[in-house]
């Protein structure tokens, strides 16, 4: 009994002593990656490749402005809307209050992944450019047809885009009963 207790106590001391002694590290970055050295460790550096990737989207709302509706907008949805195995990108958008007062609006944007590190804006072709004060969004298959649908939470009425399975979407907000003008954040 004493021998078992001693063994258990020794094992616990060993475990506690070695807890957190090692730090898991991933593989080193490829030779072409930008890196810096910090305390002898290689740290990868991020490079902005937005333009090279073909993404020309600009979020127009102004979070530093005085109206709360401006500070709560913005969202990014990753989805494979055409089920080709590559993630596509949907950006939500909202105008500033000043833009809205002048009758201007802001649309979200859907970018198709070209499988080569670039993207193509397919917003108009896909039919997902309805302007709104977007607060965020979600992706899901609301009708269980196997295709990802897009739900955008908006101040002034949410938008539900049904994926038609052919690269296009249909706005079914009213039919689905989600176009309530109550402010909803996502």
Model-derived regions: residue spans:
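Acidic, glycine/proline-rich Ca2+-coordinating loop motifs
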Residues: 1, 18-186
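Bacterial N-terminal signal peptides
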Residues: 6-18
């Amino acid at each position: 009994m004493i021998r078992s207790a001693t063994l258990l106590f020794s094992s616990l001391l060993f475990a506690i002593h070695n807890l957190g002694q090692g730090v898991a590290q991933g593989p080193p970055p490829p030779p072409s990656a930008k890196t810096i050295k910090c305390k002898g460790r290689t740290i990868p550096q991020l490079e902005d490749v937005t333009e090279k990737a073909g993404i020309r989207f600009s979020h127009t709302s102004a979070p530093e402005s005085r109206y709360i509706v401006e500070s709560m907008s913005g969202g990014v949805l990753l989805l494979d809307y055409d089920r080709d195995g590559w993630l596509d990108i949907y950006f939500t958008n909202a105008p500033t209050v000043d833009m809205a007062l002048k009758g201007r609006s802001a649309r979200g944007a859907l970018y198709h992944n070209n499988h080569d590190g670039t993207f193509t804006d397919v917003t108009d072709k896909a039919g997902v450019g309805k302007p709104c004060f977007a607060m965020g969004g979600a992706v899901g298959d609301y009708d269980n047809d196997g295709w990802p649908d897009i739900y955008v939470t908006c101040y002034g009425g949410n938008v539900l885009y049904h994926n038609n399975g052919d690269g296009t979407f249909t706005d079914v907000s009213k039919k689905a009963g989600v176009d309530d003008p109550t402010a909803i954040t996502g």
